[in-house]
Amino acid sequence: MSSSSPAGTARTIRKKVYDASLKAMFTLRPERIHGIIADGLGVLQMATPVNRAMGRVIGVNDPVLSQEVFGVTFPRPLGLAAGFDKNATAADTWTALGFGYAELGTVTASPQAGNPTPRLFRLPADRAILNRMGFNNAGAADVADNLRRRKSRDVIGINIGKTKVVPAEQAVDDYRRSASLLGDLADYLVVNVSSPNTPGLRDLQAVESLRPILAAVQESTSVPVLVKIAPDLSDEDVDAVADLAVELGLAGIVATNTTISREGLVTPAHEVAEMGAGGISGPPVAERALEVLRRLHARVGDQLVLIGVGGISTPEQAWERIAAGATLLQGYTGFIYGGPDWIRDIHLGLAEQVKAHGLSNISEAVGSGLPWKDSAV
């Protein structure tokens, strides 16, 4: 896109405005900014004409990007990752910002406040975020009420997790309760057993613990069920979860959540140590998230839908995930640092690659191993 074209000029203006806004926002505590943005998007959700106008300006509506996945039509492959819209207060706004869909939550069966603040930190040198939010949310019943008030039919998934005070031996019933309350209000459900911020949660990724949870969720809803895994799993455990997902007939796997690793960071180690425990999202998780995705695709082929998430910053990286086996993509940290044009740039880049390779739809590129063609941009 030429910077002198009307579209290029508009993009330049949007970028300058967003960069200036980001600089101002970064003077505030991260969770305060999150609250301001979430409240603003909640208000915007009620302004349907504004939403539609935004969607026309920012959204990339190219038919080569539209796919039918587990019986649901996704107009664009990049969606909002779970963690931003925890209570579904802006569910009708995300596609207006350019996303193809949104994964809401994480939602727990009972409301909970999450971990003590501060619990959200920026690592600007890494364009990353560290969080230990702890599934703060209004609870499944309240979120269900919010979803019933939706006006649009934009595609949404709901990410469900374990209530912190519920002991591990009661986790099955806890997940079942959330699935029963929320399943019929979503296009798909994701079972989150991979957040590092709820004590003992990641232990539920072990197959013997995970099997009854997934089976209970499947029994509680008719919508597709996926499981979200951590990048910190061993390769053997990744294989075991993949095999279980195929055995149970799950719709897919979301790969991956945040990492507890602190390796390879640009941010000084003492600064990261002062932030404390938590999972890191953004570029530091990208390499391992891609490794896990490739391993999953090699293991399951097209038996499961794979959703690639973790450190996707550029159109090239997005294409790499598609070529490695991801049917859909998600992002959160890239959106924080890049704004709506990050979403638009990724979708434009993906559409250009589809055409450059002589394909008719992005689904043909999934798992293809096709390289990025520089001549396409």
Curated annotation (Swiss-Prot):
EC class? oxidoreductase
Q: What is this entry's stated membrane topology?
A: Peripheral membrane protein
Please tell me whether the keyword Isomerase is annotated for this protein.
Answer: no
Q: Which residues form the active site?
A: 195
Pathway this chain belongs to: Pyrimidine metabolism; UMP biosynthesis via de novo pathway; orotate from (S)-dihydroorotate (quinone route): step 1/1
Q: Which GO terms describe its molecular function?
A: dihydroorotate dehydrogenase (quinone) activity
Q: List localization entries.
A: Cell membrane
Q: Kindly state which keywords UniProt assigns to this record, in alphabetical order.
A: Cell membrane, Flavoprotein, FMN, Membrane, Oxidoreductase, Pyrimidine biosynthesis
Q: Which family does it belong to?
A: Belongs to the dihydroorotate dehydrogenase family. Type 2 subfamily.
Q: What does this protein do?
A: Catalyzes the conversion of dihydroorotate to orotate with quinone as electron acceptor.
Q: By what name is this protein known? A: Dihydroorotate dehydrogenase (quinone)
